[in-house]
């Protein structure tokens, strides 16, 4: 009996002390390569919400939000050309209001944050409103989905920062949303 316990102990110790890392380290290296993207006259070049999105086929897009016209632009990262854009409706049955920030899970699941509302909207590439998730108990505040603080999804939970109005409110500075239970 003692041998079984000792064997289990060493097996547990061996597994827990494994040097295998689930995620490898990455390193950025400076290159002489320049990425240049042409923008049209309707697009402001002072955007602060941007990210890189890789689709299921491995194609990479540089994405950014044009706050002025409620649009998310997708540029082919390799060809450095506009690929497509999505412009969610602000009003109506598919309305999401004025967006400020987004998280692209895939082109059928694009989460957008409303600038004036404490909630999260789920749309697809065609801008169909699929779901709305209000953040109960929070006053309307500005969600801070900026390039320096993008929403992050880990398994079934989406984490994002918000900018509470500390002068008059006591809202939290971040929100975690379980995408399955919507809590």
Descriptions of predicted regions:
Residues 2-9:
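Sec-dependent signal peptide recognition
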Residues 15-16:
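C-terminal motif of bacterial Sec signal peptides marking the signal peptidase cleavage site
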Residues 20-42, 73-89, 121-140, 173-183:
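Surface-exposed loop/turn elements that mediate protein-protein interactions on large endomembrane-trafficking
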Residues 38-72:
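Beta-strand-rich domains and repeat architectures in extracellular enzymes and scaffolds
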Residues 44-51, 97-101, 145-149:
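Signature of short aromatic-glycine-proline-rich micro-motifs recurring in repeat-based ectodomains
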Residues 58-67, 103-115, 121, 150-169, ...:
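Short beta-strand elements that form the blades of beta-propeller/WD-repeat-like
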Residues 81-117, 133-145:
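Blade-loop segments of beta-propeller domains
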């Amino acid at each position: 009996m003692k041998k079984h316990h000792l064997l289990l102990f060493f097996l547990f110790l061996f597994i827990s002390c494994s040097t295998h890392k689930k995620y490898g380290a990455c390193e950025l290296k400076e290159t002489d390569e320049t990425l240049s993207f042409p923008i049209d006259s309707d697009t402001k070049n002072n955007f602060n919400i941007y990210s890189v999105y890789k689709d299921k086929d491995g194609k990479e897009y540089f994405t950014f939000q044009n706050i002025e016209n409620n649009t998310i632009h997708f540029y082919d990262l390799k060809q450095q050309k506009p690929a497509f854009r999505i412009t969610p409706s602000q009003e109506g049955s598919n309305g999401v209001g004025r967006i400020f920030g987004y998280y692209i899970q895939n082109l059928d699941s694009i989460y957008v944050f409303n600038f004036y509302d404490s909630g999260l909207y789920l749309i697809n590439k065609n801008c169909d409103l699929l779901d709305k998730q209000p953040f109960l108990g929070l006053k309307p505040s500005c969600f801070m989905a900026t390039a320096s603080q993008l929403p992050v999804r880990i398994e079934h939970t989406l984490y994002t920062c918000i900018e509470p109005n500390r002068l008059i409110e006591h809202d939290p500075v971040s929100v975690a949303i379980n995408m399955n239970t919507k809590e």
